[in-house]
Amino acid sequence: MMTKTGLVLLFAFLLVFPVSSLPMDAEAGHARLEMDKRDAGNEAWTRLLKRYEENCGTEYCTSKIGCPGRCVCKEYNYNGEITRRCRA
């Protein structure tokens, strides 16, 4: 059994170093790192997709070559010539 002094020291130790400040286990740390990497990847993918969508007007398309991102291939008639271009 602990003495009163031992209990006071234990209580003081827990006040100074709470359990929540202990380092997390390896699995939780790895999961958090993976989540951070995935979020960073999603941000990069979103920026790339936005850039592709902004550049829809400069992309030509055919029946075999589609358009980037959410752009769609539309036909236009310029002075009798049919041209297919990607549009948002």
Curated annotation (Swiss-Prot):
The keyword Disulfide bond applies. It is found in: Secreted. Disulfide bonds join 56-71, 61-73, 67-86. The keyword Disulfide bond applies. One of its GO terms (molecular function) is toxin activity. Residues 1-21 form the signal peptide. It comes from the Eukaryota. Expressed by the venom duct. Residues 22-49 form a propeptide. One of its GO terms (cellular component) is extracellular region. Keywords: Cleavage on pair of basic residues, Disulfide bond, Secreted, Signal, Toxin. This is Augerpeptide Hhe9a.
